[in-house]
């Protein structure tokens, strides 16, 4: 919904010409946000209109903030903290990046695909997480520059679409996921 997207972008201070990258996760070593910041720095050299939004909190927050300040990109990075409205917020972004060292099946990644975000994640994440063709898996052995070039290439001239039907077809509707989680916890 373009109207909702516009409202969210306005709330977050994202200008019309800016490209909004997001990351959702606890600020911990396993989520690999230090590498994400390296990727983002490379994105800024390709196009100065990139912005990074980090949703989550954790023990590495101050260390990550120091790194961002030392790279002089603090005006382009926003920490949003822990949010209960991630599914709503992600509608305002253009891309979600998950460079995790290891991960199961991140719910935020499924939500991102439902909102038709381009998703770039490490190949350590289960291939079961791929629902749409707009999800790309990259090796962590690639450089931050390689990741940045791939992200920029994927976002160039991209048009958004409605993935609701695709998500439901793949078995990821709210009801289906809730029932699967209940079964896991109750068994």
Model-derived regions, located:
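A charged, aromatic-enriched C-terminal amphipathic alpha-helix characteristic of glycosyltransferases
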Residues: 12, 159-187
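A short helix/loop element that forms part of the nucleotide-sugar donor recognition site in Leloir-type
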Residues: 1-14
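A conserved mid-protein helix/loop that constitutes part of the nucleotide-sugar donor-binding site
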Residues: 19, 23-42, 59-65
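A structural motif in glycosyltransferase catalytic domains
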Residues: 21, 36-37, 52, 147, ...
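Aromatic "clamp/platform" in nucleotide-sugar-dependent glycosyltransferases that forms part
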Residues: 82, 101
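Nucleotide-activated donor-binding/catalytic signature segment of Leloir-type glycosyltransferases, i.e.
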Residues: 65-81
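Short hydrophobic beta-strand element within catalytic cores of glycosyltransferases
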Residues: 118-122
């Amino acid at each position: 919904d373009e109207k909702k997207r516009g409202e969210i972008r306005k709330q977050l201070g994202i200008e019309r010409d800016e490209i909004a990258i997001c990351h959702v996760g606890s600020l911990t070593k396993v989520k690999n946000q230090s590498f994400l910041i390296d990727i983002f720095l490379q994105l800024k050299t390709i196009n100065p209109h990139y912005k990074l939004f980090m949703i989550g909190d954790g023990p590495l927050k101050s260390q990550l903030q120091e790194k961002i300040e030392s790279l002089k990109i603090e005006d382009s990075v926003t920490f949003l903290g822990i949010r209960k409205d991630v599914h709503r917020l992600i509608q305002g972004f253009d891309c979600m990046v998950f460079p995790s060292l290891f991960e199961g099946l991140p719910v935020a990644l499924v939500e991102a695909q439902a909102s038709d975000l381009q998703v770039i994640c490490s190949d350590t994440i289960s291939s079961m997480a791929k629902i749409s063709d707009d999800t790309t898996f990259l090796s962590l052995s690639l450089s931050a520059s390689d990741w940045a070039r791939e992200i920029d290439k994927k976002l160039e001239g991209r048009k958004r679409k409605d993935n609701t039907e695709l998500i439901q077809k793949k078995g990821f509707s709210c009801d289906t996921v809730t029932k699967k989680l209940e079964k896991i916890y109750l068994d």
